[in-house]
């Protein structure tokens, strides 16, 4: 586990009261509840900067896993403290928010990331620090995942294709682009490789190192990817530009190079490719633990709250 922790345990909390959807205070420093006034995004940014400063002052190598709750609901920017009491019983905030509020929430996060990067540069650690920015899923509510269809809780591209930005001064060519397909589990393999550390033999990694891609963005290797989700009985497999997708009882085959919006179902035009992709997903799924029958899915909102995406 981590040596230090600061933040909430729940996925979303009020940005000012720091209470979760059950109304319980949910801000922790290590394993102890912590109370500190302030906008949560700013508090997380300051703690991250303090950690980096202390590590560099002690000449101690560090790994910082920085997870903002922004721009997760409730829809509160830095200037919206007055909203805190009114949303305490409805953190999903289904009747609130706006594109402008969403923009400001992202801007506050961006300010914190910028301050952290400035700190690393100012302390002369840029060439020794690999920085990765990404997201756990596509956006929901006020975000726009164009040109992709869908969002959070979907295995269509709008739900799973997210930014992946890397900075490592002297190692990653500035302003370069890569077409390499990758997935979150590749983080750990890449970080260990960059640090020159082997994974523990008792805990083999599922991910693959992207270090060669970092240094040579034109380099690519085949990286089959698999997903499954209880919500709507979804399944997906990507290999190269091909993608197999199942939603409810409907199955699709897409060529993402020519159809990133997943509008042209090619399963009947390319039946062999479709069956191969489906069989590969089934073989992978057979190696995974079964999803318990009692596992539940709660979106927090539905068609009664807003139209479908």
Give residue spans per PLM region.
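Histidine-centered active-site microenvironments of extracellular/periplasmic hydrolases
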Residues: 1, 73-79, 83-86, 111, ...
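Formylglycine-dependent
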Residues: 1-61, 68-77, 88-94, 100
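Loop/turn elements at helix/coil->beta-strand transitions in domains of secreted/extracellular proteins
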Residues: 1-3, 58-64, 125-131, 221-223, ...
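Short, solvent-exposed turn/loop segments enriched in Gly/Ser/Thr/Pro and often Arg
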Residues: 8-12, 65-74, 133-141, 206-207, ...
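Active-site rim elements
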Residues: 32-39, 96-103, 151, 171-182, ...
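Beta-strand elements within well-structured catalytic alpha/beta cores of enzymes
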Residues: 62-67, 106, 113, 130-135, ...
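Polar, surface-exposed loop/tail segments
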Residues: 127, 167, 174-235
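Long, internal low-complexity/basic segments
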Residues: 187, 239, 248-250, 256-309
């Amino acid at each position: 586990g981590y040596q230090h922790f600061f933040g909430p345990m729940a996925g979303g909390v009020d940005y000012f009261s720091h209470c979760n959807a059950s109304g319980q205070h949910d801000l922790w420093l290590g394993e102890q509840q912590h109370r500190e006034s302030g906008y949560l995004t700013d508090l997380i940014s300051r703690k991250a900067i303090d950690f980096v400063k202390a590590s560099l002052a002690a000449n101690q190598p560090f790994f910082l896993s920085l997870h903002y709750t922004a721009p997760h609901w409730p829809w509160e920017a830095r200037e919206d403290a007055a909203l805190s009491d009114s949303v305490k019983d409805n953190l999903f905030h289904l009747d609130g928010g706006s594109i402008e509020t969403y923009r400001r929430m992202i801007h506050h996060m961006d300010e914190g990331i910028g301050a952290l990067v400035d700190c690393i540069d100012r302390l002369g650690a840029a060439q020794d620090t690999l920085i990765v920015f990404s997201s756990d899923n596509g956006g929901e509510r006020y975000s726009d995942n164009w040109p992709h269809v869908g969002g959070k809780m979907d295995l269509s591209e709008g739900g799973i294709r997210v930014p992946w930005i890397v900075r490592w001064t002297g190692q990653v060519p500035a302003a370069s682009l890569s077409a390499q397909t990758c997935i979150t589990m590749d983080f750990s393999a890449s970080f260990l490789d960059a640090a020159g550390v082997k994974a523990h033999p008792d805990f083999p990694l599922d991910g693959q190192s992207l270090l060669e891609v970092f240094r040579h963005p034109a380099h690519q290797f085949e990286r089959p990817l698999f997903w499954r989700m209880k919500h709507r009985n979804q399944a997906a497999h990507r290999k190269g530009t091909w993608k197999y997708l199942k939603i409810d009882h409907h199955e699709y085959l897409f060529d993402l190079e020519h159809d990133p919006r997943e509008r042209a179902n090619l399963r009947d035009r390319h039946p062999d490719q479709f069956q191969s992709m489906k069989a590969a997903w089934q073989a992978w799924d057979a190696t995974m633990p079964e999803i318990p029958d009692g596992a539940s899915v709660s979106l927090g909102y539905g068609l009664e709250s807003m139209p479908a995406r």
